[in-house]
Amino acid sequence: MTARDARGGFRVAVTGIGVKSPAGNTPEEAYQTFLAAESTAAPVDRLAAEAVPVRFACLVPPFEPEAYLTRREARQIDRVTMLALCAAADAVADARPPGDLAPERTGVQLGTGIGGLPSMEATARDHGDSPMGMPVHTVPRTMANSPACRIAMRFGFRGSCTTYATACASGTTALGEAARKIRYGELDMALAGGADAPVTTVIMSGFARMRALSLRNEEPRLASRPFDAGRDGFVVGEGAAMLMLERWDLAVARGATVHGEITGYADNCDAFHIVAPHEDGSVAAACMRSALADAGLSPSDVGHVNAHGTSTLLNDHAEAAAIGRCFGGQSPPVTALKGVTGHLIGGSGALEAALALRCASVGLVPAIANTVSSPEADLVDLVTGSPRAVRSAPVLSNSFGFGGQNACLVLAPPP
């Protein structure tokens, strides 16, 4: 197998995956939950104000952070950094990097849409009347770059350490930019992905005030329903996913297990509205086409599409229109994972990329949870009802965020 892609850059292998998500705390657990199309939405009791109209979310199931963190780390970090660090540790363990790894050639690229805002919210609540009594680690906890920097500190990675804030596209942006750095020789390896922990009173209230959230408090497991005719808003989730990316030739030379490859990436901006997508999907479609071109592929080469699919009226319709434009009305099978996990904000794109790669490798795509009938069914081939067998082929994974941020990845299963 050649070490270079069609453009002469280094190929980018995925050699490690770690997840902490509502669907499960390992890639296999998450994949099985997605295959079952089981929603993880449930009532939550961590919201301080009774006036918050939405009382449910998708939370990471219990695990043992103390197995990953020192007591000092646990005292100094907040939840988003904890989830990111634990997912990163699993990805490193999966990748088993060489002992002679060059730290200056290994980086961390991480996306987050909310960052440390939950810590600032808690500090304002608990210490608003006595600000000098706030924890000494308040500022480091609230910095958006804390998760990436803590990961770099933990593993001694001294290469590029960058945090991306492209709203709900943040995790996908981080993966794509990490792949570019490896492709063009800036890094040999990178831990890349996304994380967010947005299930808090202020954040949930803010989304609810925008009328962006589902109000199905009496039936939360039916609330997230991407592309379904009865969708009424998204469900907030939390979580992190980190992937170890590596120069293909170096991974093969050391006998690493290769889970797949990032072959294409593109990003652009609608430049249309601060929270709404352009309804005709033209700019998002251009982003998809650019990602395919970056991978040296045509639309017919794609085995399936992992849609952003938030379960909102505007986003799902605009994305369906964009997919229709990109594929010229010949849509491959389209799935969307947020029916299971809700929306992890900056963590969603990274988790979905990891699971999309698994689906492409296995050749079995999950049905979209809770989706029965769709007004977009004439635009795209939605996978509903039961999992669908697909050919082993590259997958296009989409992420779109507030501000008109679009990011698309093309991932290929291992040869």
Spell out what each predicted region is.
Residues 1-73, 249-261, 354-368, 407, ...:
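ACP-dependent fatty acid/polyketide chain-elongation machinery
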Residues 1-9, 95-111, 124-136, 153-161, ...:
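Structural signature of cysteine-dependent C-C bond-forming condensing enzymes
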Residues 2-9, 43-86, 115-177, 186, ...:
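Conserved catalytic cysteine-centered active-site region
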Residues 10-15, 39-43, 218-295, 303-304:
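Condensing-enzyme catalytic core mediating Claisen C-C bond formation in acyl metabolism
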Residues 16, 34, 88, 108, ...:
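Conserved small-residue
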Residues 18-20, 112-115, 166-170, 194-199, ...:
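Acidic, glycine-rich active-site loops and adjacent beta-strand->loop/helix elements
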Residues 24-25, 119-122, 200-206, 272-275, ...:
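Short acidic, glycine/serine/threonine-rich loops at helix termini
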